[in-house]
């Protein structure tokens, strides 16, 4: 890093909420919400509301987006030795279960809950096998494709854990701002 003063410009990169800048590949977040340290507690919405929200996430738009660059027959990046056999499934990077435990989530309108749950940057495409194996586990918890006893790619898990750690404060900030906190 540099000790000198640097002029900073405020701009928005269309279609990308996070991107890398400069030779040092500094990750920059480009959004209308201020990231805040995530605050988790117990889930404060009913099972019925959870199920209703679950039926509306991922949205159709998100499911289409994770398949934009899908190549059937390509190597599965999560499970060594497996191939992508069809459409990718949209998987929450920070799980829906975890999001619903973020402080103030319960105070949001249904529309804003779905806005948070369908936040496009919080999705990745997983093969059907990988998504079924991962379930609601975090990437740090998901270590094995049990059906065939294949370890999940450590490189892939590490990349996704970094994304998860970046997204958690973004989601908390988004929830706080939508809740007027």
Question: What do these predicted regions represent?
Answer:
Residues 135-181:
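C-terminal, well-folded lobe of enzymatic/effector domains
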Residues 52-64, 105-111:
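Short Cys/His-rich Zn2+-coordinating modules
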Residues 1-34:
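HINT/intein-family self-processing domains that catalyze protein splicing or autoproteolytic maturation
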Residues 80-122:
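Histidine-centered nuclease catalytic patch
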Residues 34-58:
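A boundary/linker detector
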Residues 57-89:
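Short cysteine-rich loop/turn motifs with clustered Cys
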Residues 28-33, 91-92, 131:
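Histidine-centered active-site/metal-ligand motif
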Residues 115-148:
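Short Cys/His-centered divalent metal-binding micro-motifs
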């Amino acid at each position: 890093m540099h000790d000198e003063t640097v002029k900073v410009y405020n701009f928005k990169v269309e279609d990308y909420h996070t991107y890398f800048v400069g030779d040092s590949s500094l990750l920059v977040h480009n959004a209308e919400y201020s990231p805040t340290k995530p605050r988790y507690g117990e889930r404060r919405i009913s099972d019925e509301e959870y199920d209703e929200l679950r039926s509306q996430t991922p949205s159709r738009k998100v499911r289409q987006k994770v398949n934009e660059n899908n190549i059937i027959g390509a190597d599965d990046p999560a499970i060594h030795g497996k191939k992508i056999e069809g459409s990718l499934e949209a998987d929450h990077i920070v799980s829906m279960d975890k999001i619903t435990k973020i402080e103030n989530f319960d105070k949001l309108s249904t529309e804003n809950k779905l806005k948070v749950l369908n936040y496009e940057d919080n999705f990745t495409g997983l093969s059907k096998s990988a998504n079924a194996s991962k379930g609601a586990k975090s990437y740090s918890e998901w270590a094995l494709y049990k059906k065939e006893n294949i370890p999940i790619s450590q490189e892939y898990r590490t990349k996704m854990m970094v994304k998860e750690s970046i997204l958690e404060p973004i989601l908390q900030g988004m929830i706080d701002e939508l809740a007027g906190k």
